[in-house]
């Protein structure tokens, strides 16, 4: 399997003099084309891990390899071109006067020819269903629309990895679902690898694999079907379980014959529809 991201024994603290590490020996790898989510309580080290991978902090112990190449101070700018990061607040990412200017900004910094830029801007905005808004001012967009434009700005750069750092946490449920639908479509279209940092367990449930962090360490790694099968394990970690898990538990109490394994919302709807036909 082709490992596009490898993290080995990351140790990091924000203050050199501090006795407290934000990360304590974090290690994992991600295969090309995989969608991996990192979940955990506030302060567990999720976002710190993501930002170290993106080269936003220079001093740390351990190794980060991107597409087989070791991340160093000398090559950080070149390797960062392989990563696109979507942050929590889209307003913090806007720099252009119009939507199309903003999507083009990163490409201008990379010296991409103008003809190619125009082509990529339209292609990226079309992919996130925002082409009709390309001359609009970003400030006049809704939260969900702003985040879609932020995603367009990333995919226009043609990265190999997209990191979502709590990128849906400021959206309402409808906006959150729309953004996740768009990113899933883009992932398949461009064969991207996705690392998602999230508090939303329903969002994490659509991942290929989930890493659970606590106090700067990865304490569990599993597929969603395994991790969410029992609510007791999640409560012990200090987290909730996805909506479908709680619903299945209540339905069993009311006499529904349901499997013990975890089912996503779509899978549960399909199963219940079959039973009620």
Swiss-Prot record:
Protein name per its UniProtKB record: Energy-coupling factor transporter ATP-binding protein EcfA1
One GO cellular component term noted in the UniProt record for this chain: ATP-binding cassette (ABC) transporter complex
Record keywords: ATP-binding, Cell membrane, Membrane, Nucleotide-binding, Translocase, Transport
Topological type in the membrane: Peripheral membrane protein
Transmembrane segments: none
Stated role: ATP-binding (A) component of a common energy-coupling factor (ECF) ABC-transporter complex. Unlike classic ABC transporters this ECF transporter provides the energy necessary to transport a number of different substrates.
Family membership noted in the UniProt record: Belongs to the ABC transporter superfamily. Energy-coupling factor EcfA family.
